[in-house]
Amino acid sequence: MSEKVGAIDAWATLITPEKSHLWPDSFWHIFKRYGVYEVFRKGKTLEQMLQEMEEAGVDKIILSAFVFEGEELCSNTEAGKMALKYPDKFAMACTVDPRHGMKAYYEVERCVKEYNCCALRLEPYAYGNGKVGAPPNDKMYYPLYAKCAELDIAVVLQIGHTGPLLPSECGRPIYLDEVALTFPELRIAGAHLGQPWHEEMMTLAWKFPNVYVETSARAPKFWPDSFKAYCNSWGQDKVLWGTDYPLLSFKRCVDEVEDLGLKFEAKKKLLRDNAMRFFKLGA
C-alpha cells in the first residue's frame, strides 16, 4: 500500500560521511539511545538515501539543511543543490539562525529564489545559551515569519522536549498560539509531536487552520493512543508524517504506520496528501 500512496517525509537530513564528525557533543547520547550511534558516526551517502527511499515507498522528502552553532552539517546551499538536481525526490527546507537578524532574513529569500525552498526549519533550543532557548513567540523570529508568509513558504519548528542535552522549555506548544494568531497566513508545523505536550499540540492544530502536527523523530509504534486516534479521526487533516532520517529509517516509519490500522483515507492524508497541501508541492 505504501508504494501506491507514495509517502512524503516532512523532515529528513542528509549528513554525509564527510560531515558526520561535525555533530556536537550534546547530540551523541541521543543517537546511542535510539540505537543509531554507528549510523551517525558513519554518515549516509546520497545514493544510500535514495535507495532507502525507494525500498520504503517514499516518493519525496523535505530535505532539511542543518546548521548548529556555525557548524554546517548540511548547508542551505548543499540541500538546495540536491533539491535542484533531484526535484522529483527532494524539496528543500532551509535553516537560519534568527539571532543573525537581517542576514537570516535575506538568506531565506535567497533560498526561495535560488532553490525553490518550500519551508524554513527552526529549532528554538539552539538559539540561546545552551541552558535557555528562545521560544517561538520571541520577537526575533517575527521578521522571519513575515518573510515566510510573504514568500508563501511554511515554517516547521522543533516542538516538545529535546533529545540532545539542550533546553526543552522553549519547545512548549502553547508558544505557537501567539504566532498563529499574529500570522494567520503562515503555515506552521510543530515537529516531533510536541511530546510530552502532544495533547496541547494536537489541540492547537485543531484550533488553527494554519497549524499542523508533524511526527518526525517519534516512531509510530510508540505514538500515544490519543494521537493515533487523532490521525484516524478529528485530526486526520492536520498531521504530517516525518522520520528525522537518519534518526529513524524510512522503512521503519512507513511499516509502523501500516500497522496502526488507520482507515485508508486517513493513512493517505498522513503519509502524503497533507504534506502536498502544507508544503504546496503540487503548485
Map each language-model feature to its residues.
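Amphipathic, non-transmembrane alpha-helical secondary structure
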Residues: 46-54, 73-80, 84, 102-113, ...
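Mid-to-C-terminal alpha-helical segments outside catalytic/metal-binding sites
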Residues: 2-60, 110, 233-240, 248-283
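Short aromatic-enriched loop/helix-cap "lid" or pocket-rim segments at secondary-structure transitions
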Residues: 18-24, 75-76, 105-106, 132-134, ...
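Active-site-adjacent C-terminal substructures of enzyme catalytic domains
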Residues: 187, 194-252, 260-265
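Hydrophobic faces of well-ordered beta-strands that scaffold small-molecule active sites
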Residues: 8-12, 61-63, 91-94, 120-122, ...
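Active-site gating/metal-coordination segments in enzymes
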Residues: 59-60, 69-157, 161-163, 167-170, ...
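Active-site acidic short loop of glycosyltransferases
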Residues: 58, 88, 150, 185, ...
